[in-house]
From Swiss-Prot:
Name recorded for this polypeptide: Alpha-amylase 2
Keywords: Calcium, Carbohydrate metabolism, Cell membrane, Disulfide bond, Glycoprotein, Glycosidase, GPI-anchor, Hydrolase, Lipoprotein, Membrane, Metal-binding, Signal
Site residues (Transition state stabilizer), renumbered to this chain: 325
Organism in which the protein naturally occurs: Schizosaccharomyces pombe (strain 972 / ATCC 24843)
Entry note: cofactor: Binds 2 calcium ions per subunit. Calcium is inhibitory at high concentrations.
Disulfide bond sites: 56-64, 176-191, 267-311
Residues of the propeptide: 552-581
Signal peptide: 1-24
Family: Belongs to the glycosyl hydrolase 13 family.
Keyword Calcium in record: yes
């Protein structure tokens, strides 16, 4: 009797687990179909019942009270934009206290790898968040900072005693400060970050004891918390061999942060075996293309071609226009149409789209710490035009994936590019982007030849609710209105499979002047963008050097011709004046 009972129980448990989805880990190929919403836990949402207007000044570098429960309570808000993955800031115990460098609300000053950060909640509450995410088919990308451990300074008084599990100096490289000026690889990978007040001791990633401990640790984290993917922080500061071992131990999708404007440098990590990296080499060209910088869309096309040449698989790279370290897209760009074009590029271009929290609310702050605002101060506005735009593009992207099996593995083709526009096609999806701006009242037309289209084929613009017919010569002419982006898909596919796109986004847009408040929360704006010199920004000089080196590039030729033209006009007038003097 007991034997039969045990057999029945075993069969019962087997049947039960057969119907429970396995969420612990997903491959790079699976992640290509996802889109990611990046969150800083402390700044996303307060506990239920907390005062929603609680002050949070990013400049103070203090904990503001966001928790894992807060995230769980606002998953409807995230799903309303169509996201099916979130990237959350590091979860492990950080140094305590508030010194001149502030507090560790961001999670990157790890001091104990075996305990969670109590400021964000308990282990049970974190597990409840994971369970609710997976119940909704939302994956979690966990941010991990393991190349260094945080120790309170000053240097002469520091102690490894509270650093867990590496509580001895033998587990770290000898102290030296990273030399940012020399770009020496030995310094970058073996010296320390931080400062005299907060030291980020550089873990000896060549030490086999350290490697063994971290391999077991990361494997356990993935299994214990049902993690779907991992984001490695600051991969530039450790050898590629270290990250490959960590990635193999995790046995799930991994994406690294390599802060560089060079496609060759970044792609080398992927080509060596790492699944993916955040596409910094494309970030700056995207920003400049849809801003007032003078480089515009032709420079973006050059960057695209460079990355295509250097990388093995661009469709798994993380595409973004902002994060917790960089200025928000609205900081130097207050033109609503251009911002919409930048967002559309991220959502429709090759790779995994990543949207930093607050982008959907048009937060307009500068870099760290200003760009780490409290989202609750926006009241989680689901009527904002950018919130709606992201939702439409996310749902459209999902619908296309269901219809076109190889969509996520197909590279986009540039059909047309000029200084003010770029047209790309990915299977049957055609994206027309421009930087004319919302003030351009002229109805501008762009003509291009879609791949695989026949005369009289019709395309539907899901953003502007317009239909276009292919001409007898195989070309398609679209009209740019107020500088808004255009996303086209065959009308037959829209009508049969995408009925939700029969309504347009634009009639719902209310254009109102920007209102800047202390939280950096602003409404959509009609103002022109602010210009800035790209060479003043990290990675900007690298890209500028690469771009200017390509003398055959059309953009550079155009600038050269303009300069020659000015000289030819100016010199004849200037010479008589010089002679008279």
């Amino acid at each position: 009797m007991n034997y039969r009972r045990n057999i029945c129980l075993r069969i019962g448990w087997m049947l039960l687990f057969a119907f429970i989805p396995a969420y612990a880990g997903h491959s790079a190929e699976e992640w290509k179909r996802r889109s990611i919403y990046q969150i800083i836990t402390d700044r996303f949402s307060l506990e239920e019942g907390a005062t929603e207007r609680i002050p949070c000044d990013p400049v103070r570098f203090m904990y503001c009270g966001g928790t894992w429960n807060g995230i769980r309570n606002h998953l409807d808000y995230i799903q309303g934009m169509g996201f099916d993955a979130i990237w959350i800031s590091p979860i492990f115990e950080n140094v305590e206290g508030n010194d001149i460098d502030g507090s560790s609300y961001h999670g990157y000053w790890t001091t104990n790898l075996y305990e969670l950060n109590h400021h964000f909640g308990t282990k049970e509450e974190f597990m409840e968040l994971i369970q609710e995410l997976h119940k909704r088919d939302i994956w979690i990308l966990l941010d991990v900072a393991i190349n260094s451990m945080a120790i309170n300074g000053p240097l002469e008084q520091m102690s490894f005693e509270k650093v867990i599990p590496f509580n001895d100096a033998s587990f770290f490289h000898p102290h030296c400060w990273v030399d940012y000026e020399s770009n020496d690889i030995e310094s970058v990978q073996n010296c320390w970050l931080g400062d005299e007040n907060l030291l980020l001791a550089d873990v000896d990633t060549e030490n086999e004891v350290v490697l063994s401990v971290l391999e077991k640790w990361i494997k356990n984290v993935v299994q214990e918390y049902d993690i779907d993917g991992i984001r490695f922080d600051a991969i530039k500061h450790a050898p590629i061999e270290f990250w490959l071992r960590m990635s193999k131990a995790a046995d799930i999708f991994t994406i690294g942060e390599y802060f560089t404007g060079s496609p060759a440098e970044a792609c080398d990590y992927q080509n060596s075996g790492l699944d993916s990296f955040l596409n910094f080499p494309l970030y700056w060209p995207i920003t400049w293309a849809f801003n007032n910088t003078g480089l515009q869309c032709e420079a973006l096309a050059i960057a695209i071609n460079q990355i295509n040449e250097e990388c093995n698989d661009i469709n798994v790279l993380g595409t973004f226009i902002g994060n917790h370290d960089l200025p928000r897209i609205s900081h130097n760009n207050t033109d609503q149409a251009r911002i919409m074009n930048a967002i559309t590029f991220v959502m429709m271009w090759d790779g995994i789209p990543i949207i930093y929290y607050g982008t959907e609310q048009n937060f307009n702050s500068y870099h760290d710490p200003f760009n780490r605002e409290a989202l609750w101060l926006s009241n989680f506005d689901m009527e904002n035009v950018y919130y709606k735009l992201i939702g439409i593009l996310n749902r459209f992207r999902k619908s296309v994936q269901r219809q076109e099996e190889n969509y996520v593995n197909t590279r986009s083709t540039i059909l047309s590019v000029k200084i003010h526009h770029i047209v790309v096609q990915k299977l049957n999806v055609i994206t027309v982007l421009n930087n004319y701006g919302i003030h351009n009242e002229e109805r501008l037309s762009i003509v291009f030849k879609p791949l695989g289209a026949s005369p009289k084929d019709t395309f539907f613009d899901i953003i502007n609710n317009q239909k276009y017919v292919v001409n007898t010569d195989g070309t398609l002419k679209v009209v740019i209105t107020n500088g808004f982006p255009i996303v086209l898909y065959p009308t037959s596919k829209i009508e049969t499979s995408l009925p939700q796109f029969t309504a347009t986004l634009l009639p719902e847009i209310t254009f109102v002047p920007s209102i800047t408040v202390t939280t950096h929360y602003v409404l959509p704006t009609l103002l022109a963008p602010l210009g800035y010199d790209i060479r003043e920004h990290p990675g900007g000089q690298q890209f500028w050097n690469t771009l200017t080196a390509k003398s055959e590039a059309k953009t550079i030729r155009s600038f050269t011709k303009l300069k020659l033209f000015i000289l030819l006009i100016a010199v004849p007038f200037a010479l008589p004046m010089i002679i008279l003097i």
